[in-house]
Amino acid sequence: MDFSVKVDIEKEVTCPICLELLTEPLSLDCGHSFCQACITAKIKESVIISRGESSCPVCQTRFQPGNLRPNRHLANIVERVKEVKMSPQEGQKRDVCEHHGKKLQIFCKEDGKVICWVCELSQEHQGHQTFRINEVVKECQEKLQVALQRLIKEDQEAEKLEDDIRQERTAWKNYIQIERQKILKGFNEMRVILDNEEQRELQKLEEGEVNVLDNLAAATDQLVQQRQDASTLISDLQRRLRGSSVEMLQDVIDVMKRSESWTLKKPKSVSKKLKSVFRVPDLSGMLQVLKELTDVQYYWVDVMLNPGSATSNVAISVDQRQVKTVRTCTFKNSNPCDFSAFGVFGCQYFSSGKYYWEVDVSGKIAWILGVHSKISSLNKRKSSGFAFDPSVNYSKVYSRYRPQYGYWVIGLQNTCEYNAFEDSSSSDPKVLTLFMAVPPCRIGVFLDYEAGIVSFFNVTNHGALIYKFSGCRFSRPAYPYFNPWNCLVPMTVCPPSS
């Protein structure tokens, strides 16, 4: 279309009031046409100022509001002009209202949108605060710039944290690898005995490694995701700041809300206290226990049970290694069971030197074992036995079991109550409660006659020391002592190195 012709046509369809292309044109009797919104606004002003009289804004010819008529012909021309006007320059669409075809030159604060003056008069924006674009551009630009700088700074911090976590993750891997090597080296020194213990520690280490490294990996993923979100916002803000005022202000409230609400969430750091989980266990202590057990096992003697010391209440096996109760005894407060009912001595007796033996007590719920050395002739009728009945007077039951009377023993009652019996100032022994990390199925007994020591070892728990009597005074030979009590499960003396 020839430019001059285009200009003439566009002039004919331009509203004399807003100087924009006609929108919903209305024509007066004088022949002039206006946008419906424009002439309606003028009529309202005339009603207030001129007491209801209206005149054409161009030629001042008076008219009645009811004589306004829609001009569809002009409306069609306007649409054709818009098509011709907009198609060559697609970029102009950004500056024109898509609803009314008017220039976008007003900013609605409530909606955060750039609108035309027709939109401003519409019901949608009624009562909203509106400003000319040039009135708010600088303030909005400053806010966007502040938001951009804050996000860039946060992103830089996130990048640094990501690098720190990456380095920390590597350090943790190296540290764990070193600890793994220590554990492997330590357990290799006692592979035969502690293979199960080694596997347990390695499993704990690997679980801790997975936990720590997974947490650090999750922290890295979280930071990567946050950086992606920040990058999207940064790109949006940079695009707006590079673009036109309309591009910058369009939907700016949403962008501002997202940028202001975005805050770097720092991942939780791995507690340094967790390093204790990865430390090699106290292998030296465990090795010391094993060494002590190995040392005393050097003195292992083949103890046999003495049938001559047994009563009809117990039975000793043919190989003289096992004793069990064959007749249970009912305990009464007034008449506690005779001590001799269950007690059995070893055939061997020791008056010097060092000796060691082991006893299998698997499955038993009661027993007493240790060392006995005769002190003086005691009336067996006054001795006492072991009781399960809660009504039994324990002071009578345990009165014999004390070093003063020649007994250095430990015992089990009621399935899980382990005790040692020491001297006391009263007539009753001092009953000590023993803690067992692992219930013993096999117990080692060590006697050092000259040193006056009787020690008990939990062979089931790598030879952990159960209890140790020191300062024992042996005036006569010492005998191994066994008492299965009225528990029908047998107790067995183990052959050396079995």
UniProtKB/Swiss-Prot annotation:
InterPro entries: B30.2/SPRY, B30.2/SPRY_sf, Butyrophylin_SPRY, ConA-like_dom_sf, PRY/SPRY_TRIM22, SPRY_dom, TRIM/RBCC, Znf-RING_euk. Auto-ubiquitinated. One of its GO terms (molecular function) is protein kinase binding. It catalyses: S-ubiquitinyl-[E2 ubiquitin-conjugating enzyme]-L-cysteine + [acceptor protein]-L-lysine = [E2 ubiquitin-conjugating enzyme]-L-cysteine + N(6)-ubiquitinyl-[acceptor protein]-L-lysine. Pathway: Protein modification; protein ubiquitination. Residues 132-248 form a coiled coil. Zn(2+) binds at C97, H100, C119, H125. A zinc finger (RING-type) spans 15-60. Changing C18A: Loss of antiviral activity and not affect nuclear bodies formation. Its main location: cytoplasm. Pfam families: SPRY, zf-B_box, zf-RING_UBOX. Keywords: Antiviral defense, Coiled coil, Cytoplasm, Host-virus interaction, Metal-binding, Nucleus, Repressor, Transcription, Transcription regulation, Transferase, Ubl conjugation, Ubl conjugation pathway, Zinc, Zinc-finger. Its EC number is 2.3.2.27. A zinc finger (B box-type) spans 92-133. The keyword Zinc applies. Induction: By interferons alpha and beta. Up-regulated by p53/TP53. Dramatically induced by progesterone in MDA-MB-231-derived ABC28 cells and T47D cells. By interferon gamma. Expression is also modulated in response to several viruses and viral antigens. It is an enzyme of class 2 (transferase). It comes from the Eukaryota. Strongly expressed in peripheral blood leukocytes, spleen, thymus, and ovary. Expressed at basal levels in other tissues. Residues 283-498 form the B30.2/SPRY domain. GO terms for biological process: defense response to virus; immune response; innate immune response; positive regulation of autophagy; positive regulation of canonical NF-kappaB signal transduction; positive regulation of defense response to virus by host; positive regulation of DNA-binding transcription factor activity; positive regulation of NF-kappaB transcription factor activity. Interferon-induced E3 ubiquitin ligase that plays important roles in innate and adaptive immunity. Restricts the replication of many viruses including HIV-1, encephalomyocarditis virus (EMCV), hepatitis B virus (HBV), hepatitis C virus (HCV) or Zika virus (ZIKV). Mechanistically, negatively regulates HCV replication by promoting ubiquitination and subsequent degradation of viral NS5A. Also acts by promoting the degradation of Zika virus NS1 and NS3 proteins through proteasomal degradation. The C-terminal SPRY domain is required for the transcriptional suppressor activity, probably by mediating correct nuclear localization. Residues 491-494 are essential for nuclear localization and nuclear bodies formation. The RING domain is essential for antiviral activity and for TRIM22 nuclear bodies (NB) formation but is not necessary for nuclear localization. Belongs to the TRIM/RBCC family. Homotrimer. (Microbial infection) Interacts with HIV-1 Gag polyprotein; this interaction seems to reduce gag production or virus budding. This is E3 ubiquitin-protein ligase TRIM22. It comes from Homo sapiens.
